[in-house]
Amino acid sequence: MTLEVIGAGFGRTGTLSLKYALEMLGYQKCYHMMELRNHPDHQGLWQAAHRGDAVDWPALFSGYTATVDWPSCNLWQALSAAYPDAKIILSLRDPEKWYDSVMNTIYASSKARFDSDEPANQAAGQWAMEIIWNRVFDGRMDDRQHVIEV
């Protein structure tokens, strides 16, 4: 099994609907951020990939034929090089509405986990901060214009 579809769109641009649509269209399984609940061991692999370390993509995506959302959308170019026959899908949303949605949902959740007293929540929040918010948006999530420009 190999990746046939790679999503390049950020979370909150319809990626969950896209995941379900791809699966309805016959793509075996579509990797999405929520897959990390079932594969907590993947967190370290994604950290390595985002550092630029070599990653065994076929092992990471074993059983999947598509991927959308974070953490893979950050690496769509590397994935495209590893899977040159895969189709790239870019999901988009009005930037202002997207920013508001992110800040009120997934960023707020990541921040709450990061600030939690519970070690497991802290670890999940730290991972999201490192992989998404700090790496992609330079840790400047409160700077609306900067985030939208990214």
Give the ranges of each region predicted by the language model.
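Extreme N-terminal starter segment of soluble prokaryotic enzymes
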Residues: 1-5
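Anion-recognition interface
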Residues: 6-13, 17-149
